């Protein structure tokens, strides 16, 4: 289950 991308961590 993939966790949502953290808003403060760029891709």
Swiss-Prot record:
Annotated TM spans: none
UniProt entry tagged with the keyword ATP-binding: no
Domain of life: Eukaryota
Keywords: Hypotensive agent, Metalloenzyme inhibitor, Metalloprotease inhibitor, Protease inhibitor, Pyrrolidone carboxylic acid, Secreted, Toxin
A GO BP annotation: regulation of blood pressure
GO molecular function, one term: toxin activity
Signal peptide: none
Tissue: Expressed by the venom gland.
Protein name: Bradykinin-potentiating peptide 11g
């Amino acid at each position: 289950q993939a966790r949502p991308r953290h808003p403060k961590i760029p891709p």
